[in-house]
Amino acid sequence: MAAQTSAASTLAFGHPKTLAAAGPKTPPAAASVSFPATQPACLLSASAARRRDVAAMVSAPPAVGTAMPSLDFETSVFKKEKVSLAGHEEYIVRGGRNLFPLLPEAFKGVKQIGVIGWGSQGPAQAQNLRDSLAEAKSDIVVKIGLRKGSKSFEEARAAGFTEESGTLGDIWETVSGSDLVLLLISDAAQADNYEKIFSHMKPNSILGLSHGFLLGHLQSLGLDFPKNISVIAVCPKGMGPSVRRLYVQGKEVNGAGINSSFAVHQDVDGRATDVALAWSVALGSPFTFATTLEQEYKSDIFGERGILLGAVHGIVEALFRRYTEQGMDEESAYKNTVEGITGIISKTISKKGMLEVYNSLSEEGKKEFNKAYSASFYPCMDILYECYEDVASGSEIRSVVLAGRRFYEKEGLPAFPMGNIDQTRMWKVGEKVRSTRPEGDLGPLHPFTAGVYIALMMAQIEILRKKGHSYSEIINESVIESVDSLNPFMHARGVAFMVDNCSTTARLGSRKWAPRFDYILTQQAFVTVDKDAPINQDLISNFMSDPVHGAIEVCAELRPTVDISVPANADFVRPELRQSS
C-alpha cells in the first residue's frame, strides 16, 4: 500500500504492501503447506490442513502487547487522542456536532463534494454531509452524480438534491467538477468503470472511498491509482441506513452516528488526513480510527461474510432446524435463535461485553454454553480462515466482479440477479412472532444459542488478530458493527431486511457464505455435542481470560450516544425494502 507522507501530514503504517509506481506485478507465491512425513500431501485435504493451522493458531491464549500495526497520524485541525486497547496504543479522533465549526478549515480547498451513487451509503453520506456543512455555515456544495436515466434521480430529489440548485447532475459532470469525489457506486461498478472515473478527475483532486475494494481489484491487475490525485477512505462500520438513522436520532445529543475507520493511501499536497477526518466528523462518527486501505478491505469483505451477515444467517438457520427437530415449537425456536441473538445477546454485548452474557447464565446454563462454544469454535474458524484467505488472495474480489456481470444477459445466457433469502418456513414464522411481540421485548437468552454465536465472534476476532489487524478494527468489524448496526435490522424485520440494506458486495457475500456456516455447524459442531464429546477446557479458559474483553470495554465508552431505532416501516432504508405498515 502506497502511503505518502508530507510535512503537513504523516502516516506510519506497520507493514503495508507497497505497490510499484507502474507496470505489472508478479503475483505473490501461494503459501506453502508442509505435510507430515507419514501422510502423503495428496491425502491431506485443504480443510484438514486449515484445521491443523487453526489448532496451532489458538493453542495458547493471545498475549497482551503482541505486535500489531502502528497507525499513528498527524492532524492540524482535529484533536488526536491516544487510547490503550489490550495493551496496544492506538489513536482516534472523537466526533460530535461541536466539531462542525472546524469543517471549513479541514475542507480547505474543497468547493464541491461529489457523491457518486445512490445505493446503501450514498443517500446517508450525502445528506449527513449536507446537513453538517450547513450547520457549519460552509458554502461547500454537496452534489449527487448519477448516470443518465437512473431511477435514483427521483429518490435524490425527494431528499432535497435538485438540478436547479446545482446539487444533482450527471455522473461525469459531477466527477469533473468536484474537488472531493466520494465514489459510492457498487464495487463491481467501480471495477468496470475506474479508468473512466480516473480520467475525469481534476489533477490534485481527492478520491474518497468508503471501502478498499477498488484497491484490491487494482492490485489483482498489477495497477495502482493515478499519481496526480490523493486517495483517502472513510469507512462507516455499518450500512448506509444506520449511518443516516443514528445521525438524525443524535441531533439533540451532540451527534450520534456510526464509528468509522479512515485511511490515507495517497497524499499529493498534504491535505488528505484532515480532509478524511473532516469527512468522518461530518458523517457523525462518534470516533474515527486509523487503518490502511488494504487492511480495511480485507477485514470488511471478510467480516460481512462472517459474523456481520453471512455467518449469523447460517447460525440461526442451523439452530432453528436443530431446535425444531428436537421438539421445540417453531415460534419458540425462532425466539430462541433470531430474537435472542438480535435482542438480549446483542444488547448485552453492546453495553457490557461478551463475558456478561456468560456471567448472566445459571450454572446449568454455563455448562450448556460451554458445550456449544467448545464444539462450534473450530468449525466456525475453519470457514472463517478459508474466507479470509479467499479475500486476501483476491479470489473473493474476482467473485464479486464476475457476479455483478451475471446480473445481465450475456453470451446467450440469462441474467441471474440476487434472489430472495427470507421466503422459507423459518422466516414466515418470524413474521408471526414479530406481529405479536411486545414492544421492547428482547427475546430469551438461550445458553446454547449464546455459546454458538459467541464462539463465532471469538473465532473471527482471533483470525483478524493473527492476521495483524488493529484492535479498533477487529472490535468494530467483529462486535460493534454486528450488535449496534446490523442485528437491529434483523430484529426489526428478518434476515433480508438486514442483508439487503447493505452493499451489493455484502449481499453477494452473505448469500455465498451463509450456507457454509449452516453446513459445518450441522455436520461437525452439533454432531460433536450430540456425541457428548468432552469440552475443550482450554478454549473456555482462553475465552474467559482473553484481553479482547478489556479492549471492548474501552470501545464501549466510545459507542453512539443513542441506540438505533429501527421500526418495521422505516422510511430511511432502501426503497424496495420499505413497507407502508
Locate each region found by the language model.
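Structural motif
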Residues: 3-4, 112-114, 141-143, 179-183, ...
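Rossmann-like NAD(P)-binding element
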Residues: 65-72, 139, 147-151, 157-216, ...
